[in-house]
Regions:
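Basic, helix-initiating cap at the start of DNA-binding domains
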Residues: 1-44, 60-61
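Amphipathic alpha-helical linker/stalk segments
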Residues: 28-31, 35, 44, 64-94
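Amphipathic alpha-helical packing segments from all-alpha helical-bundle domains
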Residues: 101, 108, 118-162, 189-200
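Amphipathic alpha-helical segments that line or abut small-molecule/effector binding pockets
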Residues: 24, 85-111, 188-192, 196
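Intrinsically disordered, low-complexity terminal tails and inter-domain linkers enriched
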Residues: 119-122, 207-252
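Hydrophobic/aromatic-rich alpha-helical bundle segments in the mid-to-C-terminal region
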Residues: 146-194, 202-213, 231, 235, ...
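Residues in the recognition helix of alpha-helical DNA-binding motifs
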Residues: 55-56, 65, 190
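Short hydrophobic/aromatic patch on the recognition helix
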Residues: 46-56
């Protein structure tokens, strides 16, 4: 006898298929550099506007879901090293290739965040759902955790995580790829050089506590150069980010 499928099961499957169709269409459009409105997404997917809006009531809701779907493995990252410098490199090596693969979605998320910031300044977005994420903070806090276990002041470790947050995410990709024209390999070299300088400078300031940084034995002279360069870069970039982004609440990864 043929198997009878109940109406609720059929409806549930249809909804799942429709949601997946919308997500895949949105991802394809974003990767082509097209940031679609919900109406444009509906047209491209062959569904009604009402259906598309039922799944994604705003561009912010759409982008948030697309980012979650495409970067899911990054959010589950767990370190394997006990060295802060090695942990940070692990995170960069693990996350950035996937971020590059879904760069269109991440750029769209940044665009949404900046648009919402502008609306907030103009007092026009009180009822609009905010696009806010905190994964960057969680992942970088996990990366610098060995410093705290080794006896470094938690406030110092937190400041390092804050500085590293300027090197991890869409903003760094935009600056180094768009302004400097770097390819992915060059981009990764610069990011890892900067992150190592920050880690080593922090450990030098903290007295090289318990070798938590993996590579802190670079020498007082080298650490001093790294410290000065890292401090200047962190201060300058932080100032620019604060002026352009309107706060750390808007995070993509």
């Amino acid at each position: 006898m043929p198997t009878t499928v109940s109406a609720p099961e059929t409806l549930s499957e249809t909804r799942t298929q429709t949601r997946e169709l919308l997500l895949q269409t949105a991802l394809s459009m974003l990767e082509q550099g097209w940031f679609p409105s919900i109406t444009e997404l509906a047209n491209a997917s062959g569904v009604s506007r009402a259906t598309a809006y039922r799944y994604f009531p705003s561009q912010a809701a759409l982008v948030s879901t697309v980012v979650d779907e495409s970067l899911g493995p990054v959010l589950q990252w767990q370190p394997t090293s006990t060295s802060v410098e090695a942990r940070v490199n692990e995170l960069l090596d693990f996350a950035y290739p996937r971020m590059e693969q879904h760069e269109g979605a991440l750029r769209a998320a940044l665009q949404v965040a900046l648009h919402q910031w502008a609306n907030e300044r103009a007092r026009r977005a009180q009822d609009e759902p905010k696009y806010r994420r905190g994964n960057r903070r969680r992942l970088l806090t996990l990366a610098v955790e060995p410093m705290v276990r080794a006896g470094v002041d938690p406030a110092v470790a937190e400041r390092l995580a804050q500085a590293l947050s300027l090197l991890y995410g869409t903003e760094a990709m935009v600056v180094l790829k768009d302004i400097w024209g770097l390819d992915f390999r060059q981009f990764m070299n610069v990011i890892k050089w900067m992150s190592s300088a920050l880690v080593r400078a922090t450990l030098a300031q903290a007295g090289g506590a318990a070798g938590a940084g993996g590579g802190a034995e670079a020498g007082a002279g080298g650490a001093g150069v790294a410290e000065g360069a890292a401090q200047g870069a962190a201060e300058g970039t932080a100032e620019g980010t604060a002026a352009a982004g309107g706060g750390a609440a808007r995070e993509q990864v």
